[in-house]
Regions:
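Conserved alpha/beta-hydrolase catalytic His-Asp/Glu region
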Residues: 118, 132-184
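Active-site loop/oxyanion-hole signature of alpha/beta-hydrolase fold enzymes
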Residues: 42-80, 238
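Gly/Ala-rich beta-loop-alpha elbow adjacent to hydrolase catalytic centers
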Residues: 81, 85, 89
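Conserved loop-alpha-helix segment in the C-terminal half of the alpha/beta-hydrolase fold
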Residues: 191-224, 230
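Alpha/beta-hydrolase fold catalytic core
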Residues: 1-15, 36-40, 74-76, 101, ...
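Conserved HGGG/HGGXW glycine-rich cap/lid loop of the alpha/beta-hydrolase fold
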Residues: 7-51
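Post-His helix in hydrolase/transferase enzymes
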Residues: 230-244
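Flexible "cap/lid" loop of the alpha/beta hydrolase fold
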Residues: 90, 94, 101-130
């Protein structure tokens, strides 16, 4: 049986870390040590990422899968999510409000309607797998994204392979282009930190609009792309630490 919820240690307030699309629980390994200072940390591998995907690739199905995985955690959690993980975090908070006491949401917005993942999926299908070495990964993707994928891909005898189906990743993203998640966001009533990179992938202004909800703080981090916590790890740590000191 594949282990999907990982106990990263620590004591006290449970803190759950949710990775982004095409990521894995391991992409948080550089943040876990300092986040552990604020509570009992758990990481999670989303369905479709190194394990079977739900039969229906809807956000609700992924949230249901997450809820099953964390059912044994009785105390309300601080949930920290990046990208897809951020969306799942606030949708989980909306459908299971008793399980969430605070949110940290990184570079994700409620409404991507009209966007398509078709070209992106075609590009992924053309990646030269397997990647024979760490250097090959970083040369192809760059140092930051290369490390992200090194932490996520399956390593086999002949190199590194994508840890899921391109069609799965495409369809997850395609759903975001057909609907919005403002209603789920408006259902949230816990303290929330919103973090957006200067070179964000989110539609302009949406995360600022999200911050109009009471109890929400918005921070835009300079010189950061979509992987804010890896592009600017020290600044990310500063703003998240400040927030955790107020809620944990």
């Amino acid at each position: 049986m594949t282990l999907v919820l990982h106990d990263e240690g620590g004591t006290g307030q449970p803190i759950l870390l949710l990775h982004g699309l095409m990521g894995s629980s391991r992409t948080w390994r550089r943040q876990v040590p300092w986040i552990r200072e604020f509570g009992h940390v758990y990481t999670f591998d989303a369905a479709g990422h190194g394990r079977p995907a739900p039969s229906e690739l809807t956000t609700e199905a992924f949230v249901d899968d997450l809820a099953s995985a964390v059912a044994s955690i009785e105390e309300p959690m601080i949930v920290i999510g990046h990208s897809m993980g951020a969306l799942h975090a606030w949708c989980f908070g909306a459908s299971h409000p008793e399980k969430v006491c605070a949110l940290v949401l990184e570079d994700m917005a409620p409404d991507f309607r009209g966007r398509t993942a078709a070209d992106w999926a075609q590009m992924i299908s053309a990646w030269p797998q397997p990647f024979a070495s760490e250097d090959a990964m970083k040369e192809f993707f760059g140092p930051v994204a290369g490390q992200y994928f090194l932490d996520s891909f399956d390593r086999r005898d002949d190199g590194w392979y994508l840890h899921g189906e391109v069609s799965t990743f495409r369809d997850i993203s395609e759903e975001w282009g057909t609907r919005h998640f403002w209603d789920q966001w408006k259902a949230i009533d816990v303290p929330t930190l919103l973090i957006e990179g200067e070179f964000t992938i989110t539609p302009e202004g949406q995360m600022r609009e999200m911050a109009e909800r009471p109890g929400t703080r918005y921070v835009r981090i300079a010189d950061a792309g979509h992987l804010v916590h890896d592009d600017q790890p020290q600044r990310y740590r500063e703003v998240v630490t400040e927030f955790l000191q107020t809620v944990s």
